[in-house]
A protein has these predicted regions:
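Low-complexity/repetitive intrinsically disordered segments
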Residues: 1-10
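Register-specific detector for alpha-helical tandem repeat solenoids, activating on a conserved position
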Residues: 2-3, 25-29, 54-55, 77-81, ...
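Predominantly recognizes leucine-rich repeat
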Residues: 6, 32-33, 58-59, 84-85, ...
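Extracellular/surface-exposed low-complexity segments
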Residues: 191-225
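Structural signature of tandem-repeat unit edges
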Residues: 9-25, 35-51, 62-77, 88-103, ...
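Residues marking helix boundaries in flexible regions
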Residues: 22, 31, 41, 57, ...
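Long, ordered, amphipathic alpha-helical scaffolds
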Residues: 187-188
Length: 225
């Protein structure tokens, strides 16, 4: 089913509720480029064998909401660009996602410029080694809590908050940046004032050059820079 509906520009709705996907391993790009798609009735994903979901909704620019409650992602190792370019999505509920096997998560939400709410508290990032551009150009997000994100295996986390021009609160208190001496996670468009929660002074020293006017907090202890 890879690329099955890719670039079907005129599609506005799809009902796939009767599709049997139990034996599928990949669904890459299945809806990618369906610019006018506003409604998708997805098949039941609870018993699938999927290992890749790359670009599945990429550039579905007209989607406002998605029901992902039936997604079984327990075997998925890659979900790169899964929602990239979904510029009309306002919120996403990923509470049913099991990401314990995911290694590649780069560009997952890139260009989701209308997202105002994103609960990632259930995501398991223990095996993720690439988070590049994860929230790039999510310009409507004002706060983001990644306190549950484990980054001990993460070797690349570049540009994670690039273009997040309205962020004023970030919690990355679980981030260690073990493999990076000077991580580039912010750009010049980051707001001039905000609060960021980090693990310790070592992490602060690695990232503070790009957000020199922000207030840093170590866990529950605040310190101004």
């Amino acid at each position: 089913m890879n690329e099955m509906f890719k670039d079907c520009y005129s599609l506005t709705s799809l009902d796939l509720s009767n599709f049997d996907i139990n034996n599928l391993q990949t669904m890459n790009d299945i809806f990618s480029g369906c610019f006018q798609l506003r409604s998708i009735n997805l098949p039941n994903f609870k018993k699938n064998q999927l290992t890749q979901l790359d670009n599945i909704f990429q550039n579905c620019k007209s989607l406002i909401s998605l029901d992902l409650s039936n997604f079984n992602t327990s075997k998925v190792g890659s979900m790169r660009c899964m929602f990239s370019g979904c510029s009309s999505l306002i919120s996403l509920n990923l509470s049913s996602f099991n990401t314990s096997s995911v290694q590649l998560m780069g560009n997952l939400f890139t260009g989701c410029s209308s997202l105002v709410s994103l609960d990632l508290s259930n995501l398991n990032t223990q095996k993720v080694n690439n988070m590049d551009n994860l929230f790039k150009d999510c310009s409507s997000l004002t706060s983001i809590d990644l306190s549950n994100f484990l980054t001990d295996s993460t070797k690349s986390i570049n540009n994670i908050f690039y273009g997040c021009s309205n962020l004023s609160y970030i919690d990355i208190s679980s981030f260690s940046f073990n493999y990076m001496s000077n991580p580039s996670i912010f750009d010049k468009n980051i707001p001039s004032v905000g609060t960021i929660v980090v693990k310790d002074e070592n992490v602060e020293n690695k990232i503070k050059n790009k957000i020199t006017h922000w207030k840093f907090q170590y866990k529950n202890i605040s310190s101004n820079i």
